[in-house]
Amino acid sequence: MIEKIWSGESPLWRLLLPLSWLYGLVSGAIRLCYKLKLKRAWRAPVPVVVVGNLTAGGNGKTPVVVWLVEQLQQRGIRVGVVSRGYGGKAESYPLLLSADTTTAQAGDEPVLIYQRTDAPVAVSPVRSDAVKAILAQHPDVQIIVTDDGLQHYRLARDVEIVVIDGVRRFGNGWWLPAGPMRERAGRLKSVDAVIVNGGVPRSGEIPMHLLPGQAVNLRIGTRCDVAQLEHVVAMAGIGHPPRFFATLKMCGVQPEKCVPLADHQSLNHADVSALVSAGQTLVMTEKDAVKCRAFAEENWWYLPVDAQLSGDEPAKLLTQLTSLASGN
């Protein structure tokens, strides 16, 4: 229902306009206060790169963060990552992730990023505290990447990158809750890079596609082409589950059942195992896998995806960030 409201297909969005105007007024006032220096943002002693979006829901930010961290690491840059830690609840903040940190403590995305990149990752509702925690334990970190947080103006940033869903883009264009917008589309004029996940990019936007890898067994880590799996039940607890189901079909998989779950939904063995019957195979997103690995069964697999950015702009962006991190 919410997708129909935000896309404009349902007329119910008009009933929510008063709340949207209030949201826009408050969020605009907050940004203006920081712009006029009526409120002061905390500036880290190292460069900060924000990877965020203008809309609620999944746009592909986390794969971009992983891509960015890995690309900078390949260039010899030591990167730290901070996040709000949505969906997690730690005993205290900031929380610096370790191999024992669970998604219940830190949230799905931070654990995924930590496992994929081995970079220092910290979470806190106050992102500046997360940055301080990383730099205290890892003083060699040269640059901070923040997963989400475009609207978290308490943390000063040197580079802003916005990720857009190229198919849904901005829906009906209204602020939350009548539409999907956290900020209006005009905000794109002030950011450093706009990355478009799928769809048809517009002038100045960097095209990106999510490339699926081989399916990975949660229990033993073996890999195979996902098309080789039979009697598949697909599960996705991400911001936009239909994207994952479409990816499976693109890979030649016709799921017997597709199960969309809420983003950041907590999972347990009983609920997940109930999704599949004898002889069926469960295929989930990598984001779901970080929550299920501890209690996985032999017929549970996940499909990792990697961001692939096209054109000349990604190389220019990486050169800019490498120069910033190196102090040049």
From Swiss-Prot:
The EC number(s) this enzyme carries: 2.7.1.130
EC top class, as a word: transferase
Pathway it works in: Glycolipid biosynthesis; lipid IV(A) biosynthesis; lipid IV(A) from (3R)-3-hydroxytetradecanoyl-[acyl-carrier-protein] and UDP-N-acetyl-alpha-D-glucosamine: step 6/6
Biological process according to GO: lipid A biosynthetic process; lipopolysaccharide core region biosynthetic process
GO cellular component, one term: plasma membrane
Binding sites annotated in the UniProt record for ATP: 55-62
UniProt catalytic activity: a lipid A disaccharide + ATP = a lipid IVA + ADP + H(+)
Keywords: ATP-binding, Kinase, Lipid A biosynthesis, Lipid biosynthesis, Lipid metabolism, Nucleotide-binding, Transferase
Gene Ontology molecular function, alphabetical: ATP binding; tetraacyldisaccharide 4'-kinase activity
Function: Transfers the gamma-phosphate of ATP to the 4'-position of a tetraacyldisaccharide 1-phosphate intermediate (termed DS-1-P) to form tetraacyldisaccharide 1,4'-bis-phosphate (lipid IVA).
Family to which the UniProt record says this protein belongs: Belongs to the LpxK family.
The protein's name: Tetraacyldisaccharide 4'-kinase
Species for this entry: Shigella flexneri serotype 5b (strain 8401)
